[in-house]
């Protein structure tokens, strides 16, 4: 297969974003110690951090023994539970603080960011257990509907929680919005091959994170680890997957959509052209990334209201 020409696929704004990102978090960051990876990742996130919108109130709280951060802009019956990205190795409440604050301000919903424990200090299923424990406690605290959301590793956790909650927490999850999630798709298929060496994330990077997360050989057939390894995709909440064209994980959104539709559910996959993994941070530098963030917030807002966001489909 011919290698993609990223000089053509990516516009000047995305290249400028990637150069800025690489100043803090270099392409070979996985070769650093875990401590150093976290340090440079945190510096990168701080460099891109935007001022919180007016009116958003934040409070660090604990749910189910897991540290969380709550964002509110007024009373709301809907709670968005957000799981941050970072390969299960880096990231936390501060890395995605501005993203959560903006979702809160623009949707009007309560947003709770979950600071699940990271690998290698806690290996699988530790991160999932934290994600699900926080979900259960949040669902017990707030009586209204819940929208699950997350990016990259956090998209994996959001989907894993949705799968595990079936038959256990009934009628509460109004939808899930997964942003360039890693769901455990076929590594010999689609974007895994076509964009194996994409800027910002490569399949080699992914293999590193999988080894660290699992503490060795990744488990097989466990949807808590890889939601696409489930054998039953019925009964899942309405699902919107938004991925980046130039990302080895993009095909996971398509595969997951197809599995849910085949099981009779509602699902939508949008592949954003000319974007790369991690583009949420580019939303103030790139018109394409900003437009995608608009779609992400639109999907969350619609699902929370009980609507299907059909208007999000790209023209």
Which ranges hold each PLM region?
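Gly/Ala-rich beta-loop-alpha elbow adjacent to hydrolase catalytic centers
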Residues: 150, 154, 158
